[in-house]
Amino acid sequence: MPSSDPIEILLKHDRWATRQILEKCVPLTPEQFNQKFEIGPGSLHAATTHLVSAQRTWCDTLAGRPVRPHLDKEGKNRTPAEIMALQDEVSSEFFALVSAHPPDQTVTRERGGKTHTFTRGTVFAHVLVHGAHHRAQCINMLRRLGVTPLPPSSVVEWSFMGDK
């Protein structure tokens, strides 16, 4: 039976929805995957790399370790399959880190020379909303490239497809 825990549902959905985007990118040519659009990070490559990189950064914060360099700042042109492999690793770690501690526990992160304190629940909510925001941009880019059908992305669609 599928989980009824909203945190587990949202974590599983986030992983699944990002994978749906990346799977639709696999058959694209490198030119299509890197095509510039006036939305978000600017291309499917940039947006999906940013999504994984941001979640990895928040994993570092939740784990209490130094933040690793952003993947989207490396200038490496990854394939959709390479980004999918990174996403599998990062989303599994995020799931474990969110599940391991209470949401009211705090974590700190330095950014722009300032130290910020967040609850783990705030980080969880931010990462998932951030992911949904950029996935919507990716769906727009896929639509503009003529990809059909567009990938499913809602929690209900995820539920219909079997709680993966």
Q: Which ranges hold each PLM region?
A:
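Residue-level preference for long, well-ordered alpha-helices that form the structural scaffold
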Residues: 3, 7-10, 79, 83
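Short, contiguous alpha-helical
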Residues: 8-73, 112-164
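Helix-adjacent hinge/juxtasegments
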Residues: 64-104
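Short, charged low-complexity linear motifs
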Residues: 1-2, 44
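A short coil-to-beta-strand element that immediately follows conserved catalytic motifs
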Residues: 101-108, 149-152
